[in-house]
Design a protein with these regions (language model features):
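RNase H-like nuclease fold core
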Residues: 68-122, 126, 134, 247-255
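Acidic, His- and aromatic-enriched active-site or binding-groove loops in soluble protein domains
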Residues: 170, 208-220
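RNase H catalytic domain
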Residues: 82-83, 88, 128-201, 205
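A cross-kingdom feature marking charged/low-complexity
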Residues: 58-74, 233-242
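Short aromatic-glycine-(Arg/Gly/Cys) micro-motifs in beta-strand/loop hairpins
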Residues: 1-41, 55, 59-62
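Acidic two-metal-ion nuclease catalytic site recognized across multiple nuclease folds
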Residues: 216-256
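Short arginine-rich
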Residues: 36-47, 60-64, 134-141, 210-215
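Short, surface-exposed amphipathic charged segments that create phosphate/polyanion-binding patches used
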Residues: 57-61, 200-208
């Protein structure tokens, strides 16, 4: 039997009653002591010690927006995907936010139905990949990706099995930005349709790309709250998914 190495990124030592981090162990019997019954434990087995070390060095985190202490000063990008049953096409969208100001919006739809078996997941993965590429392109070295599909993180980290070409391509793409381009990527899980306005905007723009009727979540929020956008170009894009009576609460930051 080939030897395995067990990398424990986060676990717990019940004997010392302390959290443990960044351990490399050489047996499952040792590993299980630190991960069994531990909520949120992060660990993985590898065939070589080098792979285990690289796993521990990965500049990638998976947090929850409600409980996670994610950085507030880096660029935040909200991603989403959608799927049209009739056309069998998917769409992607992402909304980039810096210092509570929407600075960029991007969306689009597939040109064919070759990924219909993945439904909206194809759009989710494309949105995250494009978001990281956008952040890198404007000179950011750290980005927080807010998502409601868990695979956005797990397919990037390699903790889920990659069965289709899309997830394999996504994994390779993200690993290149992590390891060769030295991007620090923080993944933050949000609950879909929970009232998070930027997440709702991402959902609306993904649906817009497929001509799917929009939910009322954005308008409901804007009836009592304001948002800020960086310029008139983004303002114009925002109003394409907002009812006219709510425009007063969309502020252009440069005109304040």
């Amino acid at each position: 039997m080939s030897k395995k190495y067990y990398a424990v990124k986060e676990g717990f030592d019940f004997n010392s009653n302390e959290q443990v981090k960044d351990l490399i162990l050489e047996s499952w019997e040792e590993c299980i002591k630190y991960v069994k019954g531990v909520k949120g434990a992060k660990y993985k087995s590898f065939g070589t010690r080098v792979e285990a070390i690289n796993f521990l060095k990965e500049k990638m985190e998976n947090l929850n927006k409600v409980t996670g202490d994610y950085p507030k000063d880096c660029i935040h990008i909200y991603v989403d995907g959608s799927y049209n049953i009739d056309s069998e096409k998917y769409a992607f969208a992402f909304v980039a936010v810096k210092d509570d100001v929407i600075i960029h919006i991007e969306n689009g739809a597939s040109t064919d139905n070759s990924k219909k078996q993945l439904r909206q997941i194809a759009g989710e993965l494309e949105a995250a990949a494009r978001a990281v590429e956008y952040a890198f392109g404007i000179g950011e070295t750290e980005v927080a990706i807010f998502h409601d599909y868990a695979g956005i993180y797990h397919h990037a980290a390699g903790t889920w099995e990659r069965k289709d070409a899309s997830s394999k391509e996504y994994f390779n793409f993200m690993q290149e930005f992590l390891n060769k381009k030295n991007m620090n990527i923080i993944f933050v899980k949000t609950d879909g349709h929970s009232g998070d306005i930027y997440n709702e905007f991402a959902d609306s723009f993904a649906k817009q790309a497929l001509h799917i009727p929009l939910s009322r979540a954005v308008d409901t929020y804007l009836q009592h709250n304001c948002i800020k956008v960086i310029n008139k170009q983004i303002w114009d894009k925002i109003i394409s998914v907002v009812k006219l009576n709510n425009l007063v609460n969309i502020l252009i930051a440069s005109e304040e």
